[in-house]
Amino acid sequence: MHDCSGLGPRSSGAPGRWAKELTRRGYLVMMPDSFTARGVPDGVCVAGPARGIDVSPERRARDAYAALAQLRQRPDVDGRRVGLMGGSHGGSTTLAAMRASGADTGEGFAAAVALYPRCATFRGIVYRPLAPLLILIGDKDDWTPAEECRKLAEAAAGAGHPVALKIYPGAHHSFDSPSPVRYVATRINPSVPGGRGATTGGHPEAWANSIQQVAAFFGRHLAVVPSRTQEKR
């Protein structure tokens, strides 16, 4: 699930990078565009959508389940082994989707990865993911602070719902971006006084390690389930 810049001309470039890495490893990748059809092709990083247009993470979670339903119609997809992944606004969408029931689509996602999501949304709530969940975030993130994700993971683990968390020292928001680190004063940011301004940009070491983390995580949780016949051999 893409970030607040969408998949249009203002895209951060991170979704495309991940698509290449995952397809290299044999995964089929679907990237739903939640913004263009709703009239916000330039994203919602700086200006929110017009009144009546809902592109919240909770609404986009429904997009994720719609994509899951489409994937399950393909003969080359094992519907039991579909993962969900998103960054920033898409990471928050991933958290919302992994907490929402997708009962109308059958079984839900088998595993999910949320990159630098807004964990503060679930402050004061014990987060219970519907499937194994991995969160990757930088400790220099001033847009979606890592400390909130640490609290979410600790509360979930304390309730018997472990959430895997990896925090990268020195990494900012969008550490998987090909762009250099920069501060943009106009970005909507509920995490700072005044509600504007955030730092984003790539961190080569965090990016390289995150590829390993995601590959290993999906490798464990989306692995082929042997049939009973195979198990007896």
Model features per residue range: what roles?
Residues 1-73, 179-200:
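Serine-hydrolase catalytic machinery in alpha/beta-hydrolase-like enzymes
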Residues 6-11, 54-130, 142:
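Primarily recognizes the serine-hydrolase "nucleophile elbow" in alpha/beta-hydrolase
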Residues 17, 21-24, 59, 63-66, ...:
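Extracytoplasmic/secreted proteins, especially bacterial periplasmic and envelope-associated proteins
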Residues 23-24, 98, 157:
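Gly/Ala-rich phosphate-binding loop of Rossmann-like dinucleotide-binding domains
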Residues 27, 76-77, 161:
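Short phosphate-binding/catalytic loops that engage adenosine nucleotides
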Residues 31-32, 86, 165:
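Hydrophobic residues in well-ordered beta-strands that form the structural core
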Residues 106, 110-170:
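The feature captures the conserved acid-bearing segment of alpha/beta-hydrolase catalytic domains
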Residues 162-233:
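C-terminal catalytic histidine-bearing segment of alpha/beta-hydrolase fold enzymes
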